[in-house]
Protein backbone atom coordinates (compact mmCIF):
# COMPACT_ATOMS: atom_id res chain seq x y z
CA UNK A 1 0.00 0.00 0.00
CA UNK A 2 1.33 3.44 -0.96
CA UNK A 3 0.17 6.46 1.01
CA UNK A 4 1.02 9.75 -0.67
CA UNK A 5 2.04 12.82 1.29
CA UNK A 6 -1.22 14.53 0.26
CA UNK A 7 -3.21 11.83 2.04
CA UNK A 8 -4.27 9.86 -1.00
CA UNK A 9 -3.90 6.08 -1.22
CA UNK A 10 -2.36 5.10 -4.56
CA UNK A 11 -1.29 2.09 -6.56
CA UNK A 12 2.49 1.84 -6.49
CA UNK A 13 2.53 0.73 -10.13
CA UNK A 14 0.88 3.99 -11.21
CA UNK A 15 2.98 6.34 -9.09
CA UNK A 16 6.41 4.75 -9.50
CA UNK A 17 6.23 3.94 -13.21
CA UNK A 18 9.47 4.98 -14.94
CA UNK A 19 10.65 7.01 -11.94
CA UNK A 20 14.00 6.97 -10.16
CA UNK A 21 13.37 6.08 -6.51
CA UNK A 22 15.02 6.97 -3.22
CA UNK A 23 13.66 4.63 -0.56
CA UNK A 24 14.46 4.48 3.12
CA UNK A 25 13.64 1.33 5.06
CA UNK A 26 12.90 1.70 8.73
CA UNK A 27 10.50 1.16 11.57
CA UNK A 28 10.17 4.95 12.06
CA UNK A 29 9.10 4.29 15.64
CA UNK A 30 9.22 7.13 16.26
CA UNK A 31 10.02 9.26 13.23
CA UNK A 32 13.08 11.22 14.29
CA UNK A 33 15.31 13.98 12.96
CA UNK A 34 18.03 11.43 12.24
CA UNK A 35 15.76 9.74 9.67
CA UNK A 36 15.09 13.07 7.95
CA UNK A 37 18.71 14.23 7.85
CA UNK A 38 20.01 10.89 6.60
CA UNK A 39 17.27 10.71 3.97
CA UNK A 40 18.16 14.20 2.75
CA UNK A 41 21.84 13.28 2.48
CA UNK A 42 21.05 10.02 0.68
CA UNK A 43 18.90 11.87 -1.81
CA UNK A 44 21.59 14.50 -2.36
CA UNK A 45 24.17 11.79 -3.02
CA UNK A 46 21.81 9.86 -5.29
CA UNK A 47 20.93 12.92 -7.37
CA UNK A 48 24.63 13.50 -8.00
CA UNK A 49 24.72 10.07 -9.70
CA UNK A 50 21.81 10.60 -12.13
CA UNK A 51 21.05 13.11 -14.87
CA UNK A 52 18.89 16.21 -14.56
CA UNK A 53 15.87 14.69 -16.30
CA UNK A 54 15.94 11.71 -13.96
CA UNK A 55 16.39 14.00 -10.96
CA UNK A 56 13.24 15.94 -11.86
CA UNK A 57 11.22 12.71 -11.75
CA UNK A 58 12.79 11.26 -8.61
CA UNK A 59 10.32 9.83 -6.08
CA UNK A 60 11.15 9.79 -2.38
CA UNK A 61 9.58 7.01 -0.29
CA UNK A 62 9.71 5.85 3.31
CA UNK A 63 9.02 2.11 3.51
CA UNK A 64 7.80 0.30 6.60
CA UNK A 65 7.83 -3.48 6.53
CA UNK A 66 5.25 -5.37 8.55
CA UNK A 67 7.97 -8.01 8.98
CA UNK A 68 10.81 -6.12 10.62
CA UNK A 69 14.17 -7.55 9.58
CA UNK A 70 15.96 -6.64 12.79
CA UNK A 71 13.26 -7.59 15.28
CA UNK A 72 11.46 -10.36 13.45
CA UNK A 73 8.10 -9.64 15.03
CA UNK A 74 4.80 -8.29 13.85
CA UNK A 75 3.29 -5.11 15.26
CA UNK A 76 -0.18 -3.66 15.52
CA UNK A 77 -1.70 -2.39 12.26
CA UNK A 78 -3.00 0.77 13.94
CA UNK A 79 0.53 1.53 15.09
CA UNK A 80 1.69 1.25 11.48
CA UNK A 81 -0.95 3.76 10.43
CA UNK A 82 0.15 6.16 13.18
CA UNK A 83 3.72 6.01 11.89
CA UNK A 84 2.48 6.56 8.35
CA UNK A 85 0.53 9.61 9.53
CA UNK A 86 3.68 11.03 11.16
CA UNK A 87 5.63 10.63 7.93
CA UNK A 88 2.85 12.12 5.80
CA UNK A 89 2.74 15.11 8.17
CA UNK A 90 6.38 15.64 7.17
CA UNK A 91 5.54 15.53 3.47
CA UNK A 92 6.76 11.97 2.93
CA UNK A 93 5.25 9.23 0.78
CA UNK A 94 4.86 5.97 2.69
CA UNK A 95 5.00 2.43 1.32
CA UNK A 96 3.85 -0.37 3.61
CA UNK A 97 4.99 -3.87 2.65
CA UNK A 98 5.23 -7.34 4.13
CA UNK A 99 8.80 -7.85 2.90
CA UNK A 100 11.59 -8.41 5.38
CA UNK A 101 14.23 -9.26 2.76
CA UNK A 102 15.89 -6.63 0.60
CA UNK A 103 16.01 -8.85 -2.48
CA UNK A 104 12.22 -9.14 -2.40
CA UNK A 105 11.84 -5.38 -2.00
CA UNK A 106 14.19 -4.78 -4.92
CA UNK A 107 12.17 -7.22 -7.01
CA UNK A 108 8.97 -5.37 -6.14
CA UNK A 109 10.39 -2.01 -7.21
CA UNK A 110 11.76 -3.56 -10.41
CA UNK A 111 8.19 -4.31 -11.48
CA UNK A 112 7.42 -0.60 -11.53
CA UNK A 113 10.51 1.11 -12.91
CA UNK A 114 13.73 0.53 -14.82
CA UNK A 115 15.23 3.77 -13.56
CA UNK A 116 17.97 3.90 -10.88
CA UNK A 117 16.93 3.04 -7.32
CA UNK A 118 18.64 4.04 -4.08
CA UNK A 119 17.76 2.05 -0.97
CA UNK A 120 18.91 3.85 2.16
CA UNK A 121 19.94 1.72 5.10
CA UNK A 122 21.98 1.84 8.27
CA UNK A 123 25.16 0.00 9.14
CA UNK A 124 23.03 -2.25 11.35
CA UNK A 125 20.87 -3.36 8.44
CA UNK A 126 23.92 -3.74 6.19
CA UNK A 127 25.42 -6.11 8.74
CA UNK A 128 22.14 -8.03 8.86
CA UNK A 129 22.28 -8.68 5.10
CA UNK A 130 25.33 -10.89 5.58
CA UNK A 131 23.58 -13.26 7.98
CA UNK A 132 22.87 -16.56 6.31
CA UNK A 133 19.63 -17.14 8.24
CA UNK A 134 17.90 -14.75 5.81
CA UNK A 135 18.91 -16.77 2.75
CA UNK A 136 18.32 -20.34 3.88
CA UNK A 137 15.48 -20.76 1.37
CA UNK A 138 17.47 -19.29 -1.54
CA UNK A 139 19.37 -21.95 -3.56
CA UNK A 140 22.26 -19.61 -4.29
CA UNK A 141 22.47 -18.30 -0.74
CA UNK A 142 23.88 -14.86 -0.03
CA UNK A 143 25.38 -14.49 -3.51
CA UNK A 144 22.00 -14.98 -5.15
CA UNK A 145 20.33 -12.74 -2.58
CA UNK A 146 22.69 -9.85 -3.30
CA UNK A 147 22.37 -10.49 -7.04
CA UNK A 148 18.62 -10.06 -6.76
CA UNK A 149 19.02 -6.98 -4.57
CA UNK A 150 21.26 -5.22 -7.09
CA UNK A 151 19.02 -5.93 -10.08
CA UNK A 152 17.72 -3.09 -12.25
CA UNK A 153 20.22 -0.40 -11.19
CA UNK A 154 19.41 -0.78 -7.50
CA UNK A 155 22.14 0.39 -5.15
CA UNK A 156 22.48 0.41 -1.37
CA UNK A 157 23.20 3.83 0.12
CA UNK A 158 24.64 3.26 3.58
CA UNK A 159 24.62 5.84 6.36
CA UNK A 160 27.20 5.70 9.18
CA UNK A 161 26.87 4.48 12.74
CA UNK A 162 28.46 5.72 15.94
CA UNK A 163 29.51 3.06 18.44
CA UNK A 164 28.62 4.78 21.67
CA UNK A 165 30.76 2.46 23.80
CA UNK A 166 34.01 2.73 21.86
CA UNK A 167 33.41 6.03 20.08
CA UNK A 168 34.21 4.34 16.75
CA UNK A 169 32.57 5.99 13.74
CA UNK A 170 31.66 3.26 11.24
CA UNK A 171 30.96 4.09 7.60
CA UNK A 172 30.26 1.93 4.58
CA UNK A 173 33.97 2.13 3.76
CA UNK A 174 35.20 1.13 7.22
CA UNK A 175 32.49 -1.49 7.85
CA UNK A 176 33.99 -4.93 8.47
CA UNK A 177 32.04 -7.61 6.64
CA UNK A 178 32.21 -11.21 7.94
CA UNK A 179 35.58 -12.74 7.08
CA UNK A 180 34.27 -15.03 4.34
CA UNK A 181 32.60 -12.07 2.60
CA UNK A 182 35.32 -9.42 2.88
CA UNK A 183 36.33 -9.66 -0.79
CA UNK A 184 32.71 -9.75 -1.91
CA UNK A 185 31.99 -6.57 0.04
CA UNK A 186 35.07 -4.84 -1.36
CA UNK A 187 33.74 -5.73 -4.82
CA UNK A 188 30.43 -4.05 -3.95
CA UNK A 189 32.21 -0.87 -2.86
CA UNK A 190 34.60 -0.77 -5.81
CA UNK A 191 31.77 -1.13 -8.31
CA UNK A 192 29.39 1.35 -6.70
CA UNK A 193 26.84 -1.24 -5.63
CA UNK A 194 27.22 -0.06 -2.05
CA UNK A 195 27.52 3.72 -1.72
CA UNK A 196 29.03 5.46 1.29
CA UNK A 197 26.76 8.32 2.40
CA UNK A 198 28.69 11.20 4.01
CA UNK A 199 26.89 12.16 7.21
CA UNK A 200 27.92 13.16 10.68
CA UNK A 201 25.72 14.65 13.36
CA UNK A 202 27.05 13.29 16.63
CA UNK A 203 24.09 14.48 18.68
CA UNK A 204 21.57 12.65 16.49
CA UNK A 205 23.73 9.55 16.04
CA UNK A 206 24.05 9.16 19.80
CA UNK A 207 20.29 8.73 20.26
CA UNK A 208 18.56 5.72 18.73
CA UNK A 209 14.80 5.47 18.17
CA UNK A 210 14.67 3.06 21.12
CA UNK A 211 16.37 5.69 23.28
CA UNK A 212 13.73 8.18 22.17
CA UNK A 213 10.95 5.74 23.02
CA UNK A 214 12.34 5.47 26.55
CA UNK A 215 12.60 9.26 26.82
CA UNK A 216 8.98 9.68 25.79
CA UNK A 217 7.86 7.01 28.26
CA UNK A 218 9.85 8.72 31.03
CA UNK A 219 8.52 12.16 30.04
CA UNK A 220 12.03 13.50 29.41
CA UNK A 221 11.74 16.66 27.33
CA UNK A 222 14.96 16.03 25.41
CA UNK A 223 12.99 13.78 23.03
CA UNK A 224 11.41 16.92 21.56
CA UNK A 225 14.82 17.96 20.21
CA UNK A 226 15.19 14.59 18.47
CA UNK A 227 11.74 14.30 16.89
CA UNK A 228 10.43 16.79 14.28
CA UNK A 229 7.66 19.05 15.55
CA UNK A 230 5.22 17.80 12.92
CA UNK A 231 5.52 14.31 14.36
CA UNK A 232 4.78 15.61 17.87
CA UNK A 233 1.25 16.41 16.77
CA UNK A 234 0.51 13.38 14.59
Indicate residue ranges for each PLM-predicted region.
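Nucleotidyltransferase catalytic core that binds NTPs
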Residues: 1-234
Amino acid sequence: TLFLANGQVAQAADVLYKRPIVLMRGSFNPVCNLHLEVMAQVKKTFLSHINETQADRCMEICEISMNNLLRGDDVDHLEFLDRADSLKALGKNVLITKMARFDNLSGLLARYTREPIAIALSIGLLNELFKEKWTEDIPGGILESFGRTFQNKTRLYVSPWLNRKSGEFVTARTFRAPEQYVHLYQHFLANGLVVDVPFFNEFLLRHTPRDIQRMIAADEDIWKTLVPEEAHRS
